Amino acid sequence: MISGWDKALLFFSTIVPSKYDHVWFIEDDVFFLNEQVLTNLDLKYPNQDLIANCDFDKNNVNTTNVNSTNVGWVWPLISIKIEKPWYAGMMCAARLSNTLLQCIRWYASKYNTLFFLEALFPTITSHFKLSYINPIELTTVTYRDVFFLEEEEEEEEEDQKRLETYIFHPMKDLNKHLELRANK
């Protein structure tokens, strides 16, 4: 089955392969206050190949056999055709360089497949020795969290600063996205 992610990767790596130096990929349940959040990250990390919530921690990497459940993750369900180590992270909001996109294109062309994107982006980044950053602004891109933004409590100054500079996942209520943007 071809996913929206597959189509987006094909578009930016093959159809318009040199139009952009970097591309942000963002799922619909990701919240950020405005485009300035992304612009600030672009300015802060202009040369990174991967910006995402992935720490490349050696304790969370799959270096053992493919059937390992390693840290309780889904490694047994993923078929990766390149040598280890394999990494994983939250890719719901990630910026990829054209260089990384071309490496993903190479993998897709060579093996006629891709794999689970939460492992694909960081594993390809590591395999090709590309640059990456796990900025504090993306530490709120998580699997399942409830953020202060979704609660009815009084905002504190620190919360306001985070709202203006961080990216949040998941925020499933898209009406809350609109409400937060309208109130700022």
Where are these regions (language model features)?
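Short, hydrophobic/aromatic alpha-helical segments in well-folded domains
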Residues: 8-12, 25, 37-40, 121
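Extracellular/periplasmic catalytic domains that process cell-envelope and extracellular macromolecules
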Residues: 17-18, 45, 87, 159-160
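Short beta-strand-to-loop acidic/aromatic patch adjacent to the donor-nucleotide binding site
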Residues: 20-29
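Short, surface-exposed loop and linker segments with low hydrophobicity and enrichment for Pro/Ser/Thr
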Residues: 1-7, 47, 159-161
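Structural recognition of the beta-strand scaffold that forms the well-ordered cores
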Residues: 24, 50-53, 134
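C-terminal catalytic/acceptor-binding lobe
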Residues: 107-184
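Active-site-proximal specificity loops/subdomain of glycosyltransferases
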Residues: 1-19
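Conserved catalytic core of nucleotide-sugar-dependent glycosyltransferases
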Residues: 31-126, 178
